Swiss-Prot record:
Residue ranges of every copy of the UVR domain listed in the record: 201-236
Species this chain originates from: Tropheryma whipplei (strain TW08/27) (Whipple's bacillus)
One GO MF term: excinuclease ABC activity
Annotated NCBIfam families: PRK00558.1-5 (NF001824), uvrC (TIGR00194)
Biological process terms in GO annotation: nucleotide-excision repair; SOS response
Keyword terms of this UniProt record: Cytoplasm, DNA damage, DNA excision, DNA repair, Excision nuclease, SOS response
Origin superkingdom: Bacteria
Bridged cysteine pairs (disulfide): none
Homology family: Belongs to the UvrC family.
Metal-binding found in the keyword field: no
Gene that this polypeptide is encoded by: uvrC
Name under which the protein is recorded: UvrABC system protein C
Cellular component terms (Gene Ontology): cytoplasm; excinuclease repair complex
């Protein structure tokens, strides 16, 4: 993967994600400064094995800006839970994030801090700082006076009939304190959970009424206790781990433009948490107002996305009635009308500011790319023409590679670049049928087949190559030259050797090495790497089909279990990395079956 330009990356807190060629998220991380953090991935040579592996298979990196590093942690956690990135699972587990847990599975539930999920407990969080969480727990005990002791101490107190120390000083109203019943205590737990779930207004209102009543009755000590509880509740609310109220499910959309290009950013919020971030660029029409641009953007967004219940905006879009009618006509659920909100509350407005910041960042990034990409791509083509002494500009370049599976199933691949950009619709895959495992003979066969398909194509056609690149050295180049002579076509051909990035040309004994920082070398490396990626993708499909057939040979593994195994582990590399315990945990899989599966997968990896 080629790193993004440093100037494109904002110096803001945010969450970044690495994706593979299929768009699967491999890794999610957070940063106080995105530019510095992402830069460290591409400049630091001392990386761990897992990060190096992740970078080797990544094809894209993206990011989302947020208001601060605490919000970055929350969004990072939300996405790790949502997408289960494989590299995050291995590098960071849930113990990095402290939670609040209410042990509802116990007869007398308690509130505690945990870094691991507890069975039969309800969890709240994550929270960014454990020392803040300890303060929060102390405040919650002050408000709800629920049990804090361990199960052993609780049983001892019940057996002895003597409350624990917390109960004796009125800090705990557990049943062992002899001041409350089990039913009354369960009501306290219910109120605590409602408070943690965001239903805080009713509790605050109730406490205020009780405080005023106590003050009116001149019960000043009780009124002071209630006042302290109200202050404690308000402090806890200011530290809530919830991004928005859990009742909020909506799309938050912001649009910014430079009068020629509009950048649209959409945060999809479900149950108070950001689940997805979408970004687009639209061509802005001349003399188009901001409200008209907003309406046009919304229409185009929901041609691509499913419709939400609510859409939250900064401003009122033009033709609001017509826009609302259009969206509701598209809505499958006719019983539910889509609400367009353009007067957001304070909490929603803060999130919209974040959405707008991301839209501005993407617009700036797009502007930089738009101004530089065209110039650099054409500079690389002019450099290639100069260095390779070509008669014409190499507008269409084709690159060829040979791959095989353990010496069998030889195949060839062809990738095409036009004007310095990949043209994936022109990519081709060839099955090579020769008796011996011979890369040179395979390359000759591959090039012959490609050239014969060009015999009826005019040389001025856009489908006719101006330059052919062979992945390999002198032997592969000789095979390609032989194929050109066999078919009778004249197309410039060079071989690119990976060891020193050497270019070999027909009839020349010495290699050509392009300047190390030149755009022309960068383009050739990009073409060669794309050729490897495409060839590897095809071989991976064949390899996995072959290993699937191997799995069917294991006694006790039928079609249903093989499919179950492949659904759990997305690739056979994951099967090899999985432990026997992970595999045997699948329904219907025993330890012996898991051992046979591991043995099969590991034996296959050695072939």
């Amino acid at each position: 993967m080629y790193p993004p330009r440093r100037i494109e990356i904002p110096c803001k807190p945010g969450v970044y994600r690495f994706e593979d060629e299929n768009g699967r998220i491999l890794y999610v991380g957070k940063a106080k400064n995105l530019r510095n953090r992402l830069g460290s991935y591409f400049t630091n040579a001392r990386r761990g094995r897992r990060i190096s592996y992740m970078l080797s298979i990544s094809k894209k990196v993206g990011w989302t800006c947020v208001a601060d590093d605490i919000e970055a942690l929350r969004l990072e956690y939300s996405w790790i839970k949502e997408f289960a990135p494989p590299c995050n699972v291995k590098l960071k587990d849930d113990k990095a994030y402290p939670f609040l847990a209410v042990t509802i599975g116990e007869q007398v539930p308690r509130l505690l801090i945990t870094r691991r999920k507890i069975q039969y407990a309800t969890h709240f969080g994550p929270y960014p700082k454990v020392f803040h969480l300890r303060e929060t727990v102390s405040l919650l005990h002050k408000i709800f006076q629920i049990r804090t002791c361990s199960p052993t101490n609780y049983k001892r107190a019940i057996a002895s009939g003597m409350p624990c120390f917390e109960g004796q000083i009125n800090k705990c109203f557990g049943p062992c304190s002899l001041k409350t019943t089990h039913l009354q205590y369960q009501k306290r737990i219910k109120n605590l959970m409602a408070f943690l779930e965001g239903q805080s207004s009713s509790l605050l209102e109730s406490l205020k009424k009780k405080m005023l009543k106590a003050s009116k009755n001149k019960e000043y000590e009780e009124a002071a206790i209630l006042r302290d509880k109200i202050q404690a509740a308000q402090t806890v609310l200011s530290r809530s781990a919830v991004l928005l109220d859990e009742t909020v499910s909506a799309d938050f959309i912001a649009v910014v433009s430079d009068n020629s290009i509009a950048s649209v950013q959409c945060f999809r919020v479900i149950a108070g948490r950001i689940k997805s971030v979408y970004s687009w660029h639209f061509e802005q029409q001349e003399d188009q107002s901001a409200s008209e641009l907003l309406s046009q953007s919304i229409i185009q967004v929901y041609d691509k996305l499913s419709l939400p219940k609510r859409i939250v905006l900064f401003d009122k879009p033009s033709y609001l009635s017509a826009l609302s009618a259009h969206l509701n006509d598209k809505n499958i659920d006719r019983s539910l009308e889509i609400e367009i909100v353009y007067h957001p509350n304070e909490q929603e407005r803060r999130l919209l500011e974040t959405v707008k910041d991301n839209a501005l960042s993407e617009l700036e990034r797009h502007r930089l790319r738009r101004s530089s990409d065209y110039t650099e791509r054409h500079r690389s083509l002019f450099e290639l023409q100069k260095y390779l002494n070509l008669n014409s500009l190499p507008v269409r370049i084709e690159c060829f590679d040979i791959s095989h599976l353990s010496g069998t199933n030889t195949s060839g691949s062809m990738v095409v670049f036009e004007n310095g950009e990949p043209k994936k619709s022109a990519y081709r895959h060839f099955n090579i049928h020769i008796d011996q495992n011979n890369d040179t003979a395979s390359m000759f066969s591959l090039i012959c087949r490609r050239l014969r398909s060009l015999e009826s194509v005019a040389q001025d056609s856009p489908d006719y190559p101006h330059l052919m690149i062979i992945d390999g050295g002198k032997p592969q180049l000789s095979a390609a030259v032989g194929a050109l002579q066999e078919v009778g076509l004249k197309i410039p051909v060079f071989a690119l050797s990976k060891r020193l990035e050497e270019l070999w040309s027909p009839g020349v004994k010495t290699s050509l090495i392009l300047p190390p920082n030149s755009e022309s070398l960068f383009l050739l490396q990009k073409i060669r790497d794309e050729s490897h990626r495409f060839a590897l993708k095809q071989q991976t499909r064949r390899r996995e089909a072959y290993l699937t057939s191997e799995l069917f040979r294991i006694p006790g593994l039928g079609k249903q279990k093989v499919m179950q195994l492949l659904r759990r582990f997305s690739s056979f590399a994951e099967i090899r990395q999985a432990s026997i315990e992970d595999i045997s945990a699948l329904p219907g899989f025993g330890v012996k079956t898991a051992e046979k599966i591991k043995e099969c997968a590991e034996a296959f990896s050695l072939k």
